[in-house]
């Protein structure tokens, strides 16, 4: 088939399922078309895609500015590059940096196929059997629309790359890459980074485009060049979503800082969501962190719905779902912003832990984390930062992130605080200054394991010192290691987990606790007439109000000759016995129910 360059007509057909996104269901723009195509054609397209990709990379048909759908490239590469360019100017006194974030209207659907084939033939040197195959593939594209069980007749599609085809992203990248060539041939200039003679003119990730400049006039020239490019190649810019951000250290946008596309003024905004990370005009990440936290909370809500629908989901499974679905949201882009502990980020996991335990504000955050055997998110954030640093070290010198890194190193040496400064500080803080000096780690996988363990060990020391409340002293005696106790996994009922957790944390609603030299409230038990202090020993072993359920649930050894020692022993033994935990949980629930009933009389 490849030898003949002929593409079967049946493979060129697709069935489109319109999927409603949001908004008015009568508006066509609020639907995303999902195209179903022949499976065999997908396999064939994958083979063609691999050959074309190898050819494009070998002949540098795709510029460094395009990071979309390329091996070894990611959204984080572009996010880091943009952040580095902004830091270059914001670390100067009065520095300003300008970025136009471009949104194309239905970019993939608007590609002019004749011009695409011309571009492939004339600009990239793709010819022969490959060119014949691509031309045949796009010579007779047809689609139909299916809604419910009804389907339309097939109709011709004359524009756009094929939806659902694995080859389409690469073809679009080749198509859009011509923009950089036109910018280079114009009077615009790139942002200087270390050793690149052209500099950075723009950043692309598939159809996500950002034009960058260090002055107002040059950015307008780039916009004019973009306008000519769109007119020439048939693309349309969505002005309602195309914005300019003026990066600066405070102050207002100047009157002269305004730009026009096609005679229409481009809106200047204080922040922009670029590739999932919100860039603030002063490079403050607080809004980005809040946005990620909000998305993560929605994902947690989905887990909770699943938890209440399927009551018997093991706790270990719930945490695996959290690590798979929620944590990646919280950590997205942390390679550039994850140098500190953000309360909004940590609270998502803390509240999830408390939800599993069935507790609320009555249990300290650090205790809830300890009961669930979890570590703070910032540990993963630090690891991702260092992992990305190692990735940059392994890049070749043509890559934008590597050039930006070398630029930031030079700035750091001159006293300008930036991303590199923070990397160095983390490595020195945790005893790996020699790694910074060597500018590499050798076996990166081994280093990451050692580095993460160092962070965990450091946190364990801090965790112990943070339990400074008198009520927490006893808790430390039977929760020595930061491992999840058996009851959390073994007790299916959240009510039972709550009872044991409150018991272990000394947070049951008893009248008084005097065991640690601090009296809380009226110490006398008002459930019985013994005129005794209502501490845990009285509650568990002595109070006659609970005699019947005590005989039922508490082993006789503990309450025959009650003592503080036996209470502590009971809690320690609960770490090893699920059956004992279950009995004690039932006792606590029943006893607290009796207590509330008598107090309400």
Residue spans of the language-model regions?
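Family-specific functional microsites
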Residues: 306, 468-601
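Basic, alpha-helical interaction scaffolds
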Residues: 263-337
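Catalytic palm subdomain of template-directed nucleic-acid polymerases
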Residues: 106-124, 202-231, 248-250, 283-285
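Conserved pre-catalytic core of RNA-dependent polymerases
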Residues: 1-178, 182
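Mobile genetic element proteins and their domesticated derivatives, centered on retroelements
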Residues: 16, 32, 44, 48, ...
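Extended C-terminal regions of large enzymes
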Residues: 319-325, 348-349, 360-509
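Short, conserved secondary-structure transition motifs
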Residues: 141-144, 243-254, 372-377
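Short, conserved micro-motifs composed of acidic
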Residues: 237-270
């Amino acid at each position: 088939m490849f030898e003949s360059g002929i593409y079967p007509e049946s493979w060129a057909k697709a069935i489109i399922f319109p999927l409603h996104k949001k908004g008015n269901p009568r508006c066509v723009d609020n639907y995303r078309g999902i195209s179903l195509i022949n499976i065999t054609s997908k396999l064939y397209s994958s083979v063609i895609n691999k050959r074309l990709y190898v050819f494009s990379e070998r002949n540098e048909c795709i510029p460094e500015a395009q990071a979309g759908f390329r091996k070894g490239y990611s959204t984080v590469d572009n996010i880091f590059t943009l952040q580095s360019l902004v830091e270059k100017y914001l670390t100067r006194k009065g520095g300003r940096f300008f970025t136009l974030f471009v949104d194309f209207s239905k970019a993939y659907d608007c590609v002019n196929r004749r011009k695409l084939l011309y571009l492939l033939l004339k600009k990239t040197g793709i010819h022969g059997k490959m060119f014949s195959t691509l031309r045949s593939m796009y010579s007779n594209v047809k689609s139909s629309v299916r809604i419910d069980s009804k389907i339309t007749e097939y109709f011709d599609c004359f524009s756009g790359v094929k939806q659902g085809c694995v080859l389409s992203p690469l073809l679009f990248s080749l198509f859009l890459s011509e923009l950089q060539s036109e910018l280079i041939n114009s009077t615009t200039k790139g942002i200087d980074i270390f050793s690149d003679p052209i500099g950075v003119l723009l950043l692309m990730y598939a159809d996500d485009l950002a034009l960058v400049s260090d002055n107002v006039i040059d950015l307008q020239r780039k916009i004019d060049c973009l306008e000519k490019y769109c007119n020439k190649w048939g693309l349309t810019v969505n002005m309602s979503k195309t914005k300019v951000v003026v990066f600066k250290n405070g102050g207002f946008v100047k009157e002269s800082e305004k730009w026009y596309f096609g005679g229409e003024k481009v809106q200047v905004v204080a922040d922009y969501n670029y590739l999932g990370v919100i860039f603030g005009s002063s490079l403050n990440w607080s809004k980005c962190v809040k946005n990620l936290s909000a998305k993560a909370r929605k994902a947690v809500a989905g887990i909770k719905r699943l938890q209440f629908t399927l009551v018997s989901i093991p706790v270990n499974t719930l945490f695996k779902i959290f690590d798979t679905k929620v944590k990646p949201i919280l950590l997205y882009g942390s390679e550039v912003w994850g140098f500190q502990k953000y309360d909004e980020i940590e609270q998502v996991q803390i509240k999830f832990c408390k939800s599993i335990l069935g507790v609320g504000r009555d249990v300290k955050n650090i205790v809830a984390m300890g009961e669930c055997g979890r570590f703070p998110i910032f540990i993963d954030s630090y690891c991702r930062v260092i992992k990305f640093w190692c990735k940059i070290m392994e890049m070749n010198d043509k890559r934008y992130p590597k050039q930006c890194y070398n630029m930031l190193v030079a700035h750091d040496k001159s006293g300008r605080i930036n991303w590199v400064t923070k990397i160095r500080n983390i490595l020195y803080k945790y005893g790996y200054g020699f790694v910074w000096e060597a500018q590499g780690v050798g076996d990166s996988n081994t280093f990451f394991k050692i580095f993460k363990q160092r962070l965990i060990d450091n946190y364990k020391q801090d965790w112990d010192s943070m339990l400074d409340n008198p009520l927490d002293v006893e808790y430390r005696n039977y929760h020595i290691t930061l491992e999840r106790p058996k009851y959390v996994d073994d007790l299916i009922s959240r009510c039972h987990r709550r009872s044991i957790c409150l018991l272990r944390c000394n947070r049951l609603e008893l009248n008084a606790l005097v065991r640690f030299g601090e009296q809380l409230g009226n110490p006398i038990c008002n459930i019985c007439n013994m005129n005794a202090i209502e501490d845990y020993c009285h509650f568990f072993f002595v109070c006659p109000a609970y005699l019947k359920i005590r005989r039922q649930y508490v082993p006789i050894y503990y309450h025959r000759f009650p003592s503080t020692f036996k209470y502590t022993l009971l809690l320690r033994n609960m770490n090893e016995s699920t059956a004992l935990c279950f009995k004690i949980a039932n006792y606590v629930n029943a006893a607290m129910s009796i207590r509330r009933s008598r107090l309400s009389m």
